[in-house]
Amino acid sequence: MKKIMKRNYKILLLLILLAFASCSFTTKTFADPDKDKLLIQVITYVLQQGHFDPIVMDDAFSEQLFKDYVENLDPAKHYFYESDIEDFKKFETNIDDQLKVYDITFFNITYNVILKRIEEAKIMYKEALAEPFDYTQDETFNTDYDKVSYVKNKREMKELWRKEMKFSTLSNYDDLYTEEKNSKEKDSTYVMKSDQEIEKEAREATLKYMDIYFNDVIDDLKREDWFEVYVNTIVGEFDPHTYYLAPKSKEDFDTKMSGKLEGIGARLQKRMDYIKIVELISGGPAWRSNELEVEDVILKVKQENEEYALNIVGMPINDAIKFIKGPKGTKVTLTIKKVDGTIKEVTLIRDIIQFDETYAKASLVEKDNVKFGVIDLPSFYLDMNNYKKLNAAVDVKREIEQLKAEGIQGLVLDLRDNGGGSLPAVVDMAGLFIENGPVVQVRSTGEPKQVLEDRDRSITWDGPLVILVNELSASASEIMAAAMQDYKRAIIIGSKQTYGKGTVQNVIDLNGWVRNNTNGDLGALALTTQKYYRISGGSVQLEGVKSDVVVPGKFSFIDVGEKDKENALPWDEIDSAKYSTWSNYFDYAAAIKNSNERMNNNHQLNLIEENAQWVKSKIDEKSVPLNYDKYKAKIALNNKEAERFEEINKYKTNLTFQSPLYEKELFAKDTTDLKEKRERWHQSLSQDVYVEEALNVLEDLKTSYNIKKVATVKN
C-alpha cells in the first residue's frame, strides 16, 4: 500500500490482447507481392465483410484513426514535436483513401519520424541525467498527458525530458536517502553519504533503467512491430475487441487459451543484450534438470541435428526464443553463463509445459460441521486442437465430482478477474448445473438468432451454488453468471456490475485468404462477428451482469468496464428464449436479504470501499511535486492515510481450507511445488471476506431445502 505513490514513472508501449473463440467463414483469395499492402488488403476486406457492425471508412473514420494512431505511437508526448503533428495532418482526412488502395505512405512517414525522434530521445535522457538535479527548486511534473501539448522546439523537448528524468530519479533519491538515514539510526558510528553522493547514485540508477528500457524494449522493436501498432489501430476503430494478431502474438494467444506450450519451461528476459532466466516453471525440463537457475544467462543455443551452436547475445528476445523453444521430445543444448561466471553446457529434452495458474482448482472448507467446496476458474480455457481433452468445463466437472465424493453441501464458483475465453466451454459448463436448456443466445448481423443449448440431460451439481464476480469478470464469465441468474440457479455476489462485454470474437487465420502467398505468415484477426444475449433477452453489453448481492471492491471507483470504452457497441435486447426457472426449493429472496444485511454492517467491506475511494483519489492526482521536501511531505501523508487500510490484509475468517483428497495423494509423489502453491491459495482464501460471505449464503440456502439427486428444468 505504501508503495503506491513511490513507483517510478515508466513509459511502455503496450498492446493488450484479449482472447475468444476460433473459426473462419469465407473463401475469397487475394494476391499481392508486398506483405504489408497484402495485409491491409485482406484485413480491410475481412472487416467490411465479417464484422458485426462494420463502419464506413470515410473522412470521419480517417480523422479518428489519425488521432488514435498518433496517441498510440507517443502516448506521453515525449517524442513528437508540434511540427511533426502538423506534417502528419496532411494525411488526416485521406488515410481512408490510402487504405482503399492498400497504400501505406502514412505509416511509412510516421515510422521514419518516430525512429528519428527515438534516437534523439536517447541523447536527451542521457544529457538530462548527466547533470545534478536541484530538489530545492519548486516545480511540478504533469502526468495528465491528454492535457499536455506537444512541444514546439528542441529546448522544450529537452526540458520535458529533464523533468521526466527528475521525476523518475526523485523516488530513487528518496529510497537511498531513507536507507542512509536508517543505517545511521541503527549505528551511530555510521557515516552517511553526502546529499551529492546520494543524488549521483539516484541518477545512475535511473540511467541504468533507461538504458535497459531503450536497449531491451525499444531497440528490439522491428518494423513489423510498429506496423502491428498501425494495423491494430485501424481494426480497433471498429470496436474495442477486434484486434490483429501478428504471428508471434497469435502464438502467445494460443498459449494463453490452452495454458500450455512446448519448450524448456523457463521465463526469459533480455537485459542489455543478454538473455537471462527469470523463472523456472515447476515441473518443466529446465526445472527438472537441476542445472539451471534464475539469473543464469543463455549465450548460445544448439539444436540436436546441428554441428555448431548459435550465438544469441544481442539477438532480439523474440528471435532468441524461437531457437530455444521446440517440439516435445527434441533436444536443445544451451551454453550457460552461471552467476559465478562459469560457463557450462546444459542439454534439455523439450516437453509440454503447463501453466497451472491457467487451470481450475478446488478447495474444501468445513463451516459449522458442514462441508463446502470452492472452485477457482481463471479463464474459460481450451486446447483448440483437442477440445474434448482440455477445456475448462471438463476440468470443473472433474473437480465437482471429487468434491461431491467428500460430501460437500454447497459450492462456490469464483469467476473474479476471469476475462472470458471459449464460448463452447462456457455452454458446456453451464450444463453442469442444469438438466438441459438454453444457455446463451447469439446473433450475427442480418441473421436469425441462434440459441446455444445444453443438450446433456445429466447434472453434475444440483445443490446450492454461489458465483463470485467483479468488474473484471467478462465475456464467457458473464454468460455463465447471467445464465445461472436467469435460471435462478445461483446467487451472484460481487461488484455492482460485471465488465459488460457482450460481443463474440472469432479468430480468423488470414493466411487462408491468400492464394499462392510467398510473403510469409500474415497472422490472424480476432474479429467481432456476433453479439450474445441472456436467455431472458437482454444483452450484457455495457451493462454487464448485476450482482444479487452487491459488495465493494478494489475496482469500484475505477473506470475499467466496457462502458468506459469510446467505441463500444451499443446495448440492445432481443426476444427471450424458451426456458423455465430452476425448481424453486431454494429461498433465494431470504438468502439475498440476509446477505445484504450482513454486508451493510461488515467492517472489512466498509474499509475496502474506503480504500477503493482513496486509491481513486490518488489516481486522479496528476501533478507531482519535484521539490524534495514537498514530495517527502506528500509521501508521508499518503503513508499515514494508508496505515488505516493495513488491517485489510490482516483480516482472518477463522476458516480452514484444504485440498481435496485426490490432490493430497498427489502431494506425496509430486515433483513440482503444487503443495506449496495450494497452501498459498488456501491462505488467501482464509483471508477473503467475499468467499466468507459466499459460504454464509450457501449455509442459508442449505437450511431451506433437502438436496435432491436430480433437479429438473422444464422447457
Regions found by a protein language model. Give the residues of each.
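Bacterial N-terminal signal peptides that target proteins for export
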Residues: 3-13
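PDZ/PDZ-like domain segments forming the peptide/carboxylate-binding groove
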Residues: 71-72, 93, 107, 112-123, ...
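Charged, amphipathic alpha-helical regulatory modules used
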Residues: 27-136
